[in-house]
């Protein structure tokens, strides 16, 4: 990373702490690097960076994801005979882990000896944790095996990471439990993290009774459960339809002064909504807000989905408004839930209003929600045909302009609507457009056209047009 040298009037007795202070004052990493470089320019009275100023600059570069510059800087440290500490090298490893580049973390780890740094237990555990976090489990197991082969003894930290790796898959959870049972024999007493990891793994694969037993053991051994432990258990209980028991754990954790987080509340709301208790989930939502815990996208999606499923559409709409006020933008999938909810209670005009709001707001369906959007749009048009034919036709035109295919049933509803109004020629034109788009009308549509004929000449001309388009 090149930087333009900034012209500072440095004092005669410049110190690394002064340089760090100036670098810290620069929010832009390139300007901070320019300060760093200027300190060693010719006019700077022979100042040489030490480990603290080098280390600070490496951290700044890593934080800005400028990894090449950070690695170049540690090479410069070595050239200038400045000791490259393990902590500086690990900061680069962690940075690569943060941006999901585990192989680069491993590469830097293997370069440690090039900088006269013999990796410690801490270094091994740090890289092992990165490999597990990035789901490089086979590599993690080999890495752990290498730790043991070079004579590094197991520690609580290293065994915790290994157990976490084993708890990622249903088939290896028992191996994780086996290591847990053997920990005391190896002089490693399980801690809160050990128990929490196992409880989370057991719950993930539906082994709730075992998780509860382990939780009880944890408390009996004065190993304090954390909010993560409680949340894992609550989520597991909700997933196995034991919502009331999960609610009791919520009360228990609050009584112990452990504040539930957004994931705790969202898990419970999901369980309540799936149990048909969306209003109770709303009460929990209000409690969550009162305690200063801000809901996230998952929270709102869970509640709105549950409310719409129980046809409590007004409550869902109010929640959507609150979501917007919080600065969270509903996606096409969430709008689709509300629109479908209105359709379920035959409020098609309101459904159309929300569809318009979604389109005007620039909210477009993605690959996953496109089919639902097509289905919902067609459903709204069909519903509008009975009492709001003009609105139905406007929405139909909007659908065509946005490339949304018109279903056969929707075409039939529109034709029926137009024929009922006596707009037969318009109905024929509509069918003509749809046929051109590649949609084949149903027998019902043909019968409607013929059945509502008032002028046989018009019918004959229209039929000829349609048959010609169909190449019959």
Curated annotation (Swiss-Prot):
Keyword NAD assigned: no
Keyword Protease carried by entry: no
Coiled-coil regions listed in the entry: none
InterPro entries, per database record: Pentatricopeptide_rpt (IPR002885), TPR-like_helical_dom_sf (IPR011990)
PPR repeats: 50-84, 85-119, 120-154, 155-190, 191-225, 226-260, 261-295, 296-330, 331-365, 373-406, 407-441
Short name of one Pfam family: PPR_1
Highest taxon in the source lineage: Eukaryota
Gene3D superfamilies, per the entry: Tetratricopeptide repeat domain
Keywords: Repeat
Protein name, as recorded: Pentatricopeptide repeat-containing protein At5g46100
Family label: Belongs to the PPR family. P subfamily.
Alphabetical list of NCBIfam families matching this protein: PPR (TIGR00756)
């Amino acid at each position: 990373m090149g930087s333009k040298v900034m012209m500072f009037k440095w004092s005669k007795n410049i110190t690394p702490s002064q340089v760090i202070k100036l670098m810290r004052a620069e929010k832009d990493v390139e300007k901070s690097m320019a300060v760093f470089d200027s300190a060693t320019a010719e006019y700077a009275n022979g100042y040489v960076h030490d480990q603290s100023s080098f280390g600070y600059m490496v951290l700044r570069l890593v934080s800005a994801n400028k990894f090449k510059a950070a690695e170049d800087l540690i090479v410069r440290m070595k050239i200038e005979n400045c000791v490259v500490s393990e902590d500086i090298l690990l900061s680069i490893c962690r940075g690569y882990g943060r941006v999901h580049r585990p192989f680069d973390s491993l590469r830097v780890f293997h370069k440690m000896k090039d900088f006269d740094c013999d990796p410690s237990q801490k270094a091994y555990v740090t890289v092992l944790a990165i490999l597990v976090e990035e789901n490089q489990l086979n590599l993690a197991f080999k890495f752990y095996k290498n730790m043991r082969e070079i004579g590094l003894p197991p520690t609580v930290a290293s065994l915790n990471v290994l157990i976490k790796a084993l708890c990622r898959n249903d088939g290896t959870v028992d191996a994780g439990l086996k290591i847990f049972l053997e920990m005391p024999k190896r002089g490693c007493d399980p801690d809160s993290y050990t128990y929490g990891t196992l409880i989370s793994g057991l719950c993930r694969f539906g082994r709730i009774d075992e998780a509860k037993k382990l939780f009880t053991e944890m408390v009996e051994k004065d190993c304090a459960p954390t909010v993560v432990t409680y949340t894992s258990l609550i989520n597991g209980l909700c997933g196995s339809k034991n919502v009331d028991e999960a609610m009791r754990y919520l009360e228990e954790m609050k009584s112990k002064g452990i504040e539930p987080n957004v994931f705790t509340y969202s898990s419970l709301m999901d369980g309540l909504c799936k149990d048909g208790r969306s209003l109770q989930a709303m009460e929990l939502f209000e409690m969550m807000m009162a305690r200063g815990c801000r809901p996230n996208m998952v929270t709102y999606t869970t509640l709105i989905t549950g409310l719409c499923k129980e046809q409590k559409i007004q409550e869902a709409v109010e929640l959507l408004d609150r979501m917007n006020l919080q600065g969270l933008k509903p996606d096409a999938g969430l709008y689709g839930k509300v629109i479908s909810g209105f359709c379920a209670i035959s409020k098609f005009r309101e459904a159309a209003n929300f569809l318009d709001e979604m389109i005007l707001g620039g909210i477009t369906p993605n690959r996953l929600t496109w089919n639902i959007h097509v289905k919902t749009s067609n459903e709204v048009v069909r519903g509008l045909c009975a009492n709001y034919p003009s609105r139905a036709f406007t929405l139909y035109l909007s659908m065509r302009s946005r490339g949304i295919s018109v279903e056969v049933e929707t075409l039939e509803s529109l034709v029926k609507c137009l024929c009922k109004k006596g707009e037969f020629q318009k109905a024929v034109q509509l069918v003509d457009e749809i046929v051109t788009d590649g949609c084949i009308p149903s027998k019902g549509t043909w019968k409607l056209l013929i059945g509502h004929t008032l002028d046989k000449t018009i019918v004959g001309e229209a039929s000829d047009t349609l048959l010609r388009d169909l190449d019959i």
